[in-house]
């Protein structure tokens, strides 16, 4: 039987764009019970509820590296390109991202508007 502290979340993560909420059990770059994993960003992490393996976890979200919003990892809310960016910041700075990222954004279901200076005539 798991001890009480393993079941008690540290808090509840809430995405500031889609309002997804999820309890998180760790915040940081190296989740407990996963010795070989170091995340590339400070993340909100929950234990994987689908497996009894304590070393398995799910990354719920992180802060946007530009504006600081809490955003989930869902493709409608953020993307990771060396750092986490919320989609509003990506859209405001789209020309700072590589062409591949811009093409990926155009394929997403989220309405994406290219700046007038980059629209094809």
UniProtKB/Swiss-Prot annotation:
| Protein known as | Cysteine-rich DPF motif domain-containing protein 1
Q: Which residues form a coiled coil?
A: none
Organism of this sequence: Bos taurus (Bovine)
Please name the gene that encodes this protein: CDPF1
Q: According to its UniProt record, which protein family does this protein belong to?
A: Belongs to the CDPF1 family.
